[in-house]
């Protein structure tokens, strides 16, 4: 039974909302429903993909929480460090922030040692010239930084622990995403969705996981309504409102497609 359809069919002029009244309305609605066949049993792959997508989104939310906490702590232990790299949450940026959680830790070591730390902070290729450039920038930031706490504060230790948690979460999420992509590639229409400009392999796997078996939709209109991007139009007399989408469908699927 479609919940929205049931709501329309059981609505009345008099508003009376109780659990007992709802059960009575649904019981009265039952005999009027047409007999339908059993719902198709989706293959295990769609269930697995959906659960993987939901877990991916949970981990992303947890990572966003960690990022917010890390940035707040950095403003107290090492203000300005977030300016060193364009991507403040890249692996190299997190590695540097984990090693140098306080400006005194930068100023107390030799320049060559600092360059070596930066050079070894990424698995990707980095030239020694670029590492030297980052080392000089880091020294300038450390000299201009005025932290709220000293290097022995608990906040320094807390920051380091949160960075370690975020790095582990990023590593685990990458492994889970690779497995999800491999699972989704078993479907014959994976490449069809992946061929759409702007949709990568991970997005393709997550879209399939959230929507399910796309072949069960008989038309694009049904798919649009399921996602909630079908058009909502309002016109009354000389009033013509701008068309909007209904947003009654799967909000997670909408986020994957347009977020």
Where are these regions (language model features)?
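A detector of single, family-specific signature residues
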Residues: 1-259
């Amino acid at each position: 039974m479609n919940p929205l359809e049931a709501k329309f069919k059981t609505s009345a002029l008099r508003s009376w909302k109780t659990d007992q009244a709802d059960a009575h309305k649904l019981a009265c609605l039952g005999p009027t429903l047409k007999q339908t066949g059993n719902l198709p049993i989706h293959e295990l792959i769609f269930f697995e993909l959906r659960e993987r997508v939901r877990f991916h989104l949970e981990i992303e939310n947890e990572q966003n929480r960690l990022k917010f906490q890390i940035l707040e702590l950095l403003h107290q232990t090492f203000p300005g460090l977030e300016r060193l790299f364009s991507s403040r949450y890249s692996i190299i940026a997190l590695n540097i922030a984990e090693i140098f959680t306080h400006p005194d830790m930068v100023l107390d070591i030799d320049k060559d040692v600092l360059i070596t730390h930066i050079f070894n902070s990424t698995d990707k290729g980095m030239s020694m010239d670029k590492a030297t450039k980052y080392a000089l920038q880091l020294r300038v930031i450390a000299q201009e930084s005025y932290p709220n706490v000293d290097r022995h504060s608990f906040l320094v230790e807390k920051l380091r622990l949160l960075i370690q948690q975020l790095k582990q979460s990023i590593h685990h999420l990458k492994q889970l995403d690779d497995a999800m992509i491999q699972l989704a590639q078993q479907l014959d229409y994976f490449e069809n969705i992946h061929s759409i400009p702007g949709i990568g392999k991970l997005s393709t796997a997550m879209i399939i996981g959230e929507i399910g078996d796309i072949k069960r939709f008989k038309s694009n209109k049904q798919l649009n309504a399921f996602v909630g991007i079908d058009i909502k139009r309002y016109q009354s007399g000389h009033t013509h409102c701008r068309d909007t989408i209904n947003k009654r469908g799967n909000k997670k699927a909408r986020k994957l497609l347009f977020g």
